[in-house]
C-alpha cells in the first residue's frame, strides 16, 4: 500500500473506459443502408452459417450487423435500424439489426419472445 507522499508524487490513474459501440455515437439506435448481405462462419467450437449484413450508417460509419431469427428479407439497399450488442462467436460483429423496423420484416410464426423479433401477436 503506498504512502501519502507516494500518492502525492504519483497519483492513482483510473482505467480508460473503452466504448464498445462507437458507431452509434451515444445514440440507442442508428439507421443505415445494407451494402452487402451474406453468411459467415463462427469461431472454433461452433459451426453454422450466420446471416450478417454490412451496413453504411447515416453518420458515415460502415459496420457489420447480425440478422437475428430464422429467415429474413434483407438485400442490398435495404434500409435497416441497428442497435448495439455483439455476437460472441462472430469476430467483428458488434451490432444487431432490429427486426420489424423499416425494411426488415419480423420473424414469421414466432410465438415466444415476439418483441425481440418484431412478430405480431398471433390471432
From Swiss-Prot:
<dbReference type="GO" id="GO:0000049">
    <property type="term" value="F:tRNA binding"/>
</dbReference>
<comment type="subunit">
    <text>Part of the 30S ribosomal subunit. Contacts proteins S8 and S17. May interact with IF1 in the 30S initiation complex.</text>
</comment>
<comment type="similarity">
    <text>Belongs to the universal ribosomal protein uS12 family.</text>
</comment>
<dbReference type="InterPro" id="IPR006032">
    <property type="entry name" value="Ribosomal_uS12"/>
</dbReference>
<keyword id="KW-0694">RNA-binding</keyword>
<dbReference type="GO" id="GO:0006412">
    <property type="term" value="P:translation"/>
</dbReference>
<dbReference type="GO" id="GO:0019843">
    <property type="term" value="F:rRNA binding"/>
</dbReference>
<keyword id="KW-0488">Methylation</keyword>
<keyword id="KW-0699">rRNA-binding</keyword>
<dbReference type="GO" id="GO:0003735">
    <property type="term" value="F:structural constituent of ribosome"/>
</dbReference>
<comment type="function">
    <text>Interacts with and stabilizes bases of the 16S rRNA that are involved in tRNA selection in the A site and with the mRNA backbone. Located at the interface of the 30S and 50S subunits, it traverses the body of the 30S subunit contacting proteins on the other side and probably holding the rRNA structure together. The combined cluster of proteins S8, S12 and S17 appears to hold together the shoulder and platform of the 30S subunit.</text>
</comment>
<dbReference type="InterPro" id="IPR012340">
    <property type="entry name" value="NA-bd_OB-fold"/>
</dbReference>
<dbReference type="InterPro" id="IPR005679">
    <property type="entry name" value="Ribosomal_uS12_bac"/>
</dbReference>
<comment type="function">
    <text>With S4 and S5 plays an important role in translational accuracy.</text>
</comment>
<dbReference type="Pfam" id="PF00164">
    <property type="entry name" value="Ribosom_S12_S23"/>
</dbReference>
<keyword id="KW-0687">Ribonucleoprotein</keyword>
<dbReference type="GO" id="GO:0015935">
    <property type="term" value="C:small ribosomal subunit"/>
</dbReference>
<keyword id="KW-0820">tRNA-binding</keyword>
<protein>
    <recommendedName>
        <fullName>Small ribosomal subunit protein uS12</fullName>
    </recommendedName>
</protein>
<feature type="modified residue" description="3-methylthioaspartic acid">
    <location>
        <position position="89"/>
    </location>
</feature>
<keyword id="KW-0689">Ribosomal protein</keyword>
